Amino acid sequence: MSKKLVAYFSASGVTAKVAETLAEAIGADIFEIEPKVPYTEADLNWMDKKARSTIEMNDPASRPEIAIKRDNMKDYDTIFVGFPIWWYVAPTIINTFLESYDMTGKTIIPFATSGGSDIGKTNERLAPSCKGAKLLEGKVFKSSVGHKELAAWVDGLKL
């Protein structure tokens, strides 16, 4: 049986809730991807062209710094990476996370939360950050998703 990690970034707490439920449902370790400089409410105002999140998402090379690295990443074979959908893709801090480790031979499975967007071009944007890893198609969940639905999703992945 492979060792699993649920790593997640959550700006508002919604993705954190889904990540915690997923980790419990599949018996995985959990790790919060925290930005070195926390996002403020103003930073997250997607309607403001000068907001930090808008600037980051409009720059494909943007890599926001992460506060803490996971020391034992080499111990994991399967990594579920959770995030809110921003501009129809993963926030660029997810690229920072993936590029911070040697992912060779690992299986990466994105999962996301959104108020109405689907997974969009998330995998297309994440693939260059997953060198040497197997990147599976991601899925968007509502904040109300339960253990049973998450466990069934993971079972369906046939890991």
At which residue positions do the language-model features occur?
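Acidic catalytic loop of the alpha/beta-hydrolase fold
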Residues: 87-88, 116
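Glycine-rich, N-terminal phosphate-binding loop of Rossmann-like dinucleotide-binding domains
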Residues: 83-84
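Short, glycine-/small-residue-rich phosphate/pyrophosphate-handling segment
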Residues: 109-146
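Short, conserved loop/helix-junction motifs that constitute active-site signature segments
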Residues: 73, 99-105, 129-130
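N-terminal beta1-alpha1-beta2 submodule of the flavodoxin-like/Rossmannoid cofactor-binding fold
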Residues: 1-78, 88-90, 95, 99, ...
